[in-house]
Amino acid sequence: MRTQGVEVESLRAVDHAIATGVWPDMTEHGWERDDWPAISDRVLGADILVICTPIWLGEKSSVCTQVIERLYGNSHLLNDAGQYAYYGRVGGCLVTGNEDGVKHCAMNILYSLQHLGYVIPPQADAGWIGEVGPGPSYLDPGSGGPENEFTNRNTTFMTWNLLHLARMLKDAGGIPAHGNQRSQWDAGCRFDFPNPDYRSPSSAGAPAELPVWVRERGPRGPLRSDSPANRGPHVRSPT
C-alpha cells in the first residue's frame, strides 16, 4: 500500500490498555484507564481497516475479539448523512498460526466488519499457517512464510481489491444515502417499506397485493423505469 502512496499505520492492540466492554469509553463505566477512544478516532479516520490475528484453538485470538467488541461499541455513531459511522470504508483481515483455522477466523472477522458497516471487497482475507504443532511463526527465520507463493498471491490480491474498492467509494462519496439512514428511520421515514396499516386486503383474508413494479419485474427481468431502484434519491416525510 505504501508503494501506491497510501498512508499506512500499524497498531498493536496488546501495546495499549484497551478496557473490556462495549461502551465507547469504559472509564465512564468503572475502568481507571481506557485507550480505546483515541484508537477509535484513528480507526474512523482511515478509509481501510485490516484486522490481523493469530489462530488459537482454531479461533481468532481473545485480543482480536476484544477489538471487534470495542468497534461494535461505537456502532451507534452516525456520519453526516445519518448512516452508521463505518459506512464508506472497506475492511479485510490477515491471519497467521501453526494450526488450521485461517478461513474460519476470516469468516468471523469479515462478517463482523460488514455487520458494522464496512464494505468487504472480493478475496479480502489472506493468511499463512506453518506445520502442525509447535514451530516458527511467520516472521521467525526459516518459517517459509514470507516466501510462500499462495500467501503472497492472496495478500497481493487482497491489497489491490481493498485499494480499488476504497477508491471507488471515495470517488462516489461513500455509500448512497438513501434507505440506510438511521437518523431518517428514527424520524419516521420508511423508504418504501410497506406500512402494515394500509394492507387492508390481508385483514379480510386475501393476500396483500404486491406493488406494480414487483409484479411486472419477473424473477430475473429488468426493473421497470418507475421502480424504486430507478428513481432518484428521495425521502418520504414521516407519517
Model segments located where?
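N-terminal beta1-alpha1-beta2 submodule of the flavodoxin-like/Rossmannoid cofactor-binding fold
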Residues: 1-81, 143-226, 231-239
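Short aromatic-enriched loop/helix-cap "lid" or pocket-rim segments at secondary-structure transitions
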Residues: 20-24, 106, 134-136
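Short, glycine-/small-residue-rich phosphate/pyrophosphate-handling segment
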Residues: 80-131, 150-153
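Phosphate-binding/catalytic loops
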Residues: 96-99, 139-143
